[in-house]
Amino acid sequence: MKPLHEILKRPLVTEKTVQQEGEAQVVAFEVKREANKVEIKKAVEQAFEVKVKNVNTVLVAGKVKRLGRTYGKRSNWKKAYVTLAEGSSIDLFGV
């Protein structure tokens, strides 16, 4: 298995993910594109000491951006929605 810091890049904190975290115990992460669901599940369970119920992944296409007269493209990336088991929670901010 790859090291944890290579699989989990960062948590995604948006209005939608904060609402899902409160209602359905779903936490979103940006993960390495090559990571599969089993690796993501093990990484989250190891890093945060929680039980994971389900993992859903989405490949997000990079946007085309304009740089003056030329066009560039941002990299594609992978998003993982991790559903936690009952009684488990992740405190991302430590507040």
UniProtKB/Swiss-Prot annotation:
Instruction: Please provide the record's keywords in A-Z order.
Output: Ribonucleoprotein, Ribosomal protein, RNA-binding, rRNA-binding
Per the record, the GO terms for biological process are:
translation
Please report a single Pfam family linked to this protein. Answer: Ribosomal_L23
Q: Determine if Metal-binding is one of this entry's keywords.
A: no
InterPro entries in UniProt = Nucleotide-bd_a/b_plait_sf, Ribosomal_uL23-like, Ribosomal_uL23/eL15/eS24_sf, Ribosomal_uL23_CS
Q: Is the keyword RNA-binding in the record?
A: yes
**One GO molecular function term?**
structural constituent of ribosome
Q: Which GO terms describe its cellular component?
A: ribonucleoprotein complex; ribosome
Source domain of life is Bacteria
Role, per record: One of the early assembly proteins it binds 23S rRNA. One of the proteins that surrounds the polypeptide exit tunnel on the outside of the ribosome. Forms the main docking site for trigger factor binding to the ribosome.
Known partners and oligomeric status: Part of the 50S ribosomal subunit. Contacts protein L29, and trigger factor when it is bound to the ribosome.
The family this protein is said to belong to: Belongs to the universal ribosomal protein uL23 family.
Q: What is this protein called?
A: Large ribosomal subunit protein uL23
Q: Which organism is it from?
A: Syntrophotalea carbinolica (strain DSM 2380 / NBRC 103641 / GraBd1) (Pelobacter carbinolicus)
Ranked from the top, the taxonomy reads: Bacteria, Pseudomonadati, Thermodesulfobacteriota, Desulfuromonadia, Desulfuromonadales
Q: What gene codes for this chain? A: rplW
